[in-house]
């Protein structure tokens, strides 16, 4: 009678009375399975912990009752506790009581839990029963992509986007497809998918970063910079940090040093490198404890002075070397070798410079000092050995 009265209260949308009646039913019959499940239904959204507590009481009484696991899985899934949801689904999802929707949610919970192999296994099980099912094909594409099985991911994507029944595409679908195509070096196709994703959800401005990355990888720096500007402009001022500005500098540097001379004029190359220099200058001032601003400033100036006739990069490499030497950390050895290589070469050229004849001895000593510093870090460094042999 109490369960019946509880059911009437549910129809009347009186949750308080309904839960009271189900509690009564359990009190008079602790094995009244229906009352536990109905009670959990009332609280699954409003108070999940109460619902879970009641279901666990039933689980203790009936450990093999898959209806309990099913309800627990549903509640954990609703509250985004995918770890617990996976545990609950595992108890029944491969058995006869599982519906297609249960399998979808199990596969998705596994995916969100980063168990891509198991998620793929469950999705493929679903596809054996229904090869054109949108959610299973979606998860196959996602999982194959995350597992870096790109050829299989591409096949799944083809089915998902061209053959599925009732497919309701989201920005995430286009984003994943973009990641997949970018991984396969299909950069133009990747951009098309990223653009579809951001059009579908304009708040996902991170996608402009993906668009920029795709263009950068095909050496289309103008478009890469343009897309990155859109991403950067979408951020609040406090989020426009030096590490994000750093990518601007890298893109300008890439544009100025790209090998394809047809894609960029000499003047455009120079302008790009000057933009890189000013960007890295701003970073050096904003983060004085980091060597990266001046290190990349040195690289930009070295590219502006490819013959090292003006020594444009010299003050920056000197500053970086002094900072990194003070840290005394082998982690910075490769950066120090780059600094010493430039400075060693700069002084090597200065030895032969007629205008600096009076300083030839001092320049020779300086060059020897820097090449020797390289050998102290890397005794097998062939460039340093050759340079020292040439000087001596």
Language model segments and positions:
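Alpha-helical oligomerization segments
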Residues: 369, 374-390
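Alpha-solenoid helical repeat scaffolds
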Residues: 1-359, 366, 386-392
């Amino acid at each position: 009678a109490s369960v019946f009265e509880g059911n009437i209260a549910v129809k009347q949308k009186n949750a308080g009375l309904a839960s009271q009646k189900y509690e009564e039913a359990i009190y008079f019959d602790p094995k009244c399975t229906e009352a536990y499940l109905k009670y959990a239904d009332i609280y699954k959204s409003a108070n999940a912990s109460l619902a879970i507590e009641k279901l666990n009481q039933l689980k203790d009484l009936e450990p093999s009752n898959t209806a309990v696991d099913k309800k627990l899985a549903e509640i954990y899934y609703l509250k985004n506790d995918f770890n617990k949801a996976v545990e609950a689904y595992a108890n029944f999802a491969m058995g006869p009581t599982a519906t297609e929707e249960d399998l979808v949610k199990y596969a998705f919970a596994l995916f969100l839990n980063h168990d891509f192999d198991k998620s793929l296994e469950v999705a493929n099980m679903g596809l054996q029963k229904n090869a054109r099912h949108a959610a299973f094909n979606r998860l196959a594409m996602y999982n194959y992509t995350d597992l870096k099985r790109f050829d299989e991911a591409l096949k799944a994507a083809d089915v998902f986007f061209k053959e599925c029944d009732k497919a309701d595409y989201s920005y995430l679908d286009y984003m994943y497809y973009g990641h997949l195509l970018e991984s396969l070096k299909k950069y133009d196709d990747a951009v098309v998918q990223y653009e579809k994703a951001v059009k579908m959800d304009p708040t996902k401005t991170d996608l402009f970063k993906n668009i920029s990355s795709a263009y950068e990888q095909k050496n289309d720096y103008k478009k890469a910079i343009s897309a990155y500007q859109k991403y950067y402009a979408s951020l609040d001022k406090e989020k426009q940090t030096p590490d994000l500005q750093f990518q601007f500098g890298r893109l300008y540097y890439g544009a100025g040093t790209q090998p394809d001379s047809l894609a960029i004029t000499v003047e455009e190359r120079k302008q790009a490198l000057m933009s890189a220099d000013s960007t890295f200058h701003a970073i050096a001032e904003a983060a004085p404890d980091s060597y990266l601003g001046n290190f990349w400033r040195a690289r930009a100036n070295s590219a502006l002075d490819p013959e090292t006739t003006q020594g444009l990069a010299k003050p920056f490499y000197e500053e970086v070397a002094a900072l990194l030497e003070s840290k005394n950390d082998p982690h910075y050895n490769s950066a120090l070798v780059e600094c010493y290589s430039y400075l060693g070469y700069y002084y090597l050229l200065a030895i032969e410079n007629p205008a600096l004849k009076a300083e030839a001895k001092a320049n020779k000593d300086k060059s020897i000092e820097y090449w020797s510093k390289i050998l102290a870090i890397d005794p097998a460094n062939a460039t340093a050995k050759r340079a020292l042999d040439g000087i001596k």
